[in-house]
Amino acid sequence: MENLKQLQERVAVSDGREKADLVIKNGRIVNVFSGEIMEGDIAIKNGYIAGIGDFSEAEQIMDAAGEFIVPGFIDAHVHVESAMVTPAEFARVLLPNGVTTIVTDPHEIANVAGEKGIEFMLEDAKGAPLDMFVMLPSSVPATEGEHNGETLHAKKLHPLYKHEKVIGLAEVMDFPSVAKGSSDILTKIIDAKKEGGRIDGHGAGLTSADLNNYLAVGIRTDHESTNAKEAVDRLRAGMFVMLREGTVGRDLLQTISAVSEKNSHRFCFCTDDKLINDLITEGSINYNIRLAIENNIDPITAIQMATINAANCHNLPYLGAVAAGYQADIVFLKDLQTIEISKVLKNGQVVVENGARNEAAFEKKHSETFISPKIQHHLSKQDLELPLTNDTCYVIGMKQNNLFTEKLMEQVNVENGKFVPSIEKDLLKMAVVERHHNTGCVGVGIVKGFGLKEGAIATTVAHDSHNIVAVGASDEAMEKAINYVTEMGGGIAVVDETGKVLHDLALPVAGLLSNKPYEEVERDLAGLLKAFNQISNAKGFDPFLTLSFLTLPVIPELKLTDQGLFDFATFQIIPNEVN
């Protein structure tokens, strides 16, 4: 927060009575308010823009050499934990991509560690040259039909609003509780309103009629549109619509046609969940901008969606524009087609130049670890058995690069009254093992789409309750993979049919995050993918993030929890067998 002296100094710079800290000359400024490209000097004082016009007196003069000057990009909805690195490391990845602000929902770590997890994320982000605003998790757990690590009722959340970086209530996922008028979720919404915060939606699978429930209680955003019709429905209902392009949720190409000259001010961009390797190779919000431009969105409109629209969406009044009184978060672009970045300023300081970070701007941190209690009993093959009385079963139909699944009915192989995986039919066994309270609960189901030839994969990243989830071609391989990630205190492992571990990634922070530099995490993810390709014929998708979302019951159609097979349409556990 600024003080009186800083405001007085900024005013003095704006009218030429004092020197600026920095003046940027010869840039072509993208005005996100008028949609114009303008010329003028940008005077910066104490991390804020003091004015745009004719300025020469400064401690430092920077020549933009005709490059385009745009505001720092804003990711309107992201789960940092999906990158499997800490917030401090996340900043190191995002800033070269021009992202200077994120709005995050730390519900992944909250599902494991409760308030302590949220506080850890806020503390770790301190000192990083990235604004990380937090929306408090609204749905921990996501539903009542599973075990997670902690439950966050309204009373537990309310004190966290005192933190200056907490700005609202995160995606309200438990739609049935909203529709029923559940006192806990409505109290959370009331508390957010009292604190002046926004309330994010999660309208996966909701019809235009269902949206009335959302809007009636004050939910004002949504990021779950998977096609243009859904995006328009949300727009017409009065929502800000976030167009998502992540690792699994790749929806931008299906939704971008909803954007028009008349309505673009109500659209912004988000990544939601994106792995570190995709952030490095594709980018973050800069990638969303490029995709939009490639699909006939005007470049300035796309930049508005990535900046001022996102700031307006979350009521961040001093972010999202290159204008007097705004935070000096500035990106230099070589052109407005490829969005090639040459320089990034955060609070008026150069943090990235020609792709290289100014490492002095990034604090070095070693994160403490939250290690969930290990499963006390050694998992056996018997825990993974799936008894059947007939051979027609509900099967989770995995869709590549899509968070939705299909509710399939398939004839499966049964031997001695138990399900047997079929490599030929690509009908594999999936299991979710509770890891937080030593309940011994194991949900077992059948999944199609992973193409395993042998072996198994297991991970403690399993949205949103983050139990252990595994998929395998045999019980023996699954048993080995599950016990291995348990013994290592959280992480991901790929094993072959002999039980040999082909590659692993340790995630000691809540079983979700590495405490290593992101470069090491990227190398391990590449190793995991190489190992997966040794045991699978399936290509063209990320198997680990895909697997982690097969346990999220608040996205259609069929998912698996530690309690069993969850049907989104009825919002309850159903038998594996078709009656």
From Swiss-Prot:
Cofactor annotation: Mn(2+)
Gene3D superfamilies: Metal-dependent hydrolases (3.20.20.140), Urease, subunit C, domain 1 (2.30.40.10)
Reactions it catalyzes: adenine + H2O + H(+) = hypoxanthine + NH4(+)
EC category: hydrolase
Biological process per Gene Ontology, one example term: adenine catabolic process
Source organism, top-level taxon: Bacteria
Keywords: Hydrolase, Manganese
GO molecular function: adenine deaminase activity
EC number: 3.5.4.2
Pfam families noted in UniProt: Adenine_deam_C, Amidohydro_1
Alphabetical list of InterPro entries matching this protein: Adenine_deam (IPR006679), Adenine_deam_C (IPR026912), Amidohydro-rel (IPR006680), Metal-dep_hydrolase_composite (IPR011059), Metal_Hydrolase (IPR032466)
Residue stretches spanning the membrane: none
KW Hydrolase (keyword) present: yes
PANTHER family (UniProt xref): ADENINE DEAMINASE, N-ACETYLGLUCOSAMINE-6-PHOSPHATE DEACETYLASE
Family matches, as NCBIfam families: ade (TIGR01178)
Protein family per UniProt: Belongs to the metallo-dependent hydrolases superfamily. Adenine deaminase family.
Name of the protein this chain belongs to: Adenine deaminase
Organism whose genome encodes this protein: Listeria welshimeri serovar 6b (strain ATCC 35897 / DSM 20650 / CCUG 15529 / CIP 8149 / NCTC 11857 / SLCC 5334 / V8)
Gene, per the UniProt record: ade
